[in-house]
Amino acid sequence: MTCDKEKTRGIRPGDIAVVVGTGRSGVAAARLLHAKGARVRVLERDAANVPATFAEWAAGAGVEIVCGAHDAAHFADAAVVVPSPGVAVATLRPYLPATGGPEVMAEMELAWRELSGEPVIAVTGTSGKTTTVSLCAHMLRTQGLSVFLGGNIGTPLCEYVLEGKRADVLVIEISSFQLQTCSTFRPRVAMLLNITANHLDYHADMQEYIDAKFRLFRCQDEDDLAVFGEGLAPLVDRYGVKARRVTFRATDRFAESRLFGAHNRANAEAAWTAAREFGVTLENALQAVATFAPMPHRLEQVAERGGVLYVNDSKCTTVSALRVALEAFDRPVLLLAGGKFKGGDLEGLIPLVRERVRAVMLFGASREVFEAAWRDVVPMTWDATLEEAVRRAASAARQGEVVLMAPATASFDLFRNYGHRGDVFRAAVESLA
C-alpha cells in the first residue's frame, strides 16, 4: 500500500478542470478551482439540480456549466476531474482518454493540497462516522481548541479552504466514495470504525469497498496514528499499515451519556483515542460525552408518551445497523421497518428478533423480503405509509416498551432521503393524540 504523491501533477493557472455534479461539494470544488486560476467546466445531468445562486456566480466568473448527458468531449482537454461523492468513478471511465488522461481527484483531495499544515483527524467506516467525528470535535472544543468539523458531514473541506480561517484541528468524516479518488491525503489520525457490506450498488464488489476504506492509511507514516475497531486486525496486517496502530473497544468509561447502546460507548472510546493525541484530558472527554446531544436520525429519542419510548433510527439502512439498534435496548421493541432493501442476512437476526422484538410493523417496499425471513418468528403487519405504521405501533405499545423505527433499508421508495424519512416519523409521533 503506497502513496501516490509522486504521481500528482498539481493544478496550474489556465488548466481546464471539470467538476461533475452541483451538490454542495461540487460547488465548493468549482469555486476553489476558479480561485486557483483554473478554467472550470461543471457538468450536471439535470439542469434542475443547479443552484440558482451558483449559476449566477458561475455566469459572472466565467465558469461553464454544461447540463445533460456526459460526452467524451467534455473531458478531452481536462487536466483534472473532480467528481461529486455520489458519482461512481467507474461511470466516468468510458468518457476519459485511455492513456494520458486527467487526474481524477475527490473534492477532499483537492482541498487537502491547499491546507496550511493543519492536523487532520479523518474517520471512515460503514457506520458510526458522524457520531464519532461529532463526539471528537466536541471533546476538542471542550478542551478549548478551535475545530473545523466537516467533510462528508455538513461543510465540504473546500469551503474551509476558501473561507481562509484556520482551526487548531480539522475533524473530517470521509466516505469510501471520496477515498477512491484521494491520492495524497494524509491525516495525522486516521480511523476505521468497522466494515460491513454496504454501497455495493456503487462499488463493484466488497473487495473494492474494503480497498477504498484502506486508502485512508496509505500516505501515513510512523509518526501518524491509525485507529481501528475490534475485529479488523487481519485486514490491517494484509494492507501493511505503517502508522502506529491502536484498537478501541466499548467500555463503561463513558457510561454517563444520553446515547443509547454499546456501539455508542465504542464510538466515544474511538473519539477519545483521537482527541487525546491533541491533549484532551479524560476529565474534559467525560464532560463532552455527558453533554453531547444525540445526532438526528441515529437512535434519536423523539418522545416518551405513556411510558412508551419513541426512537428514530432512520439512518439504519442495513441489516448490520439493525442488529446494533436492537442490541441497544433491554426492553421490548415494536419495530418499524421497510423500504428499499439493499441486501443482507435477515435470517441471521432471528435469535435477536425473537428475544427483543414483540411485533414488527412493516411499511413501504420490501414487505415480502421481511415476511419471508421472519413470518414464523414474530407477529408482523404491513401499512402502505410510515404514518399508518406509527399509528398502528402506538395503539399496540405498552408501558415500558420502545417503538423503534430502524428500517434496515434505503429510503428512496417513499422518501427523498433518510433524513426526510426520520422527519416524517417524528411528525407522525408528534401528531399522536
Swiss-Prot record:
EC number(s) given by UniProt: 6.3.2.9
Gene: murD
Disulfide bonds: none
Source organism phylogeny: Bacteria, Pseudomonadati, Thermodesulfobacteriota, Desulfovibrionia, Desulfovibrionales
The keyword rRNA processing belongs to this UniProt entry's keyword annotation: no
Described purpose of this protein according to its UniProt entry: Cell wall formation. Catalyzes the addition of glutamate to the nucleotide precursor UDP-N-acetylmuramoyl-L-alanine (UMA).
Associated pathway: Cell wall biogenesis; peptidoglycan biosynthesis
Database matches in HAMAP family: MurD
Annotated positions binding ATP: 125-131
UniProt keyword annotation of Repressor present: no
Any GO molecular function: UDP-N-acetylmuramoylalanine-D-glutamate ligase activity
Keyword terms: ATP-binding, Cell cycle, Cell division, Cell shape, Cell wall biogenesis/degradation, Cytoplasm, Ligase, Nucleotide-binding, Peptidoglycan synthesis
Protein's UniProt name: UDP-N-acetylmuramoylalanine--D-glutamate ligase
Assigned protein family: Belongs to the MurCDEF family.
InterPro entries for this protein: Mur-like_cat_sf, Mur_ligase_C, Mur_ligase_C_dom_sf, Mur_ligase_cen, MurD
Reaction(s) catalysed by this chain's protein: UDP-N-acetyl-alpha-D-muramoyl-L-alanine + D-glutamate + ATP = UDP-N-acetyl-alpha-D-muramoyl-L-alanyl-D-glutamate + ADP + phosphate + H(+)
EC class (word): ligase
Compartments, record wording: Cytoplasm
SUPFAM superfamilies found in the cross-reference section: MurCD N-terminal domain, MurD-like peptide ligases, catalytic domain, MurD-like peptide ligases, peptide-binding domain
A biological process from GO: cell wall organization
GO-annotated cellular components: cytoplasm
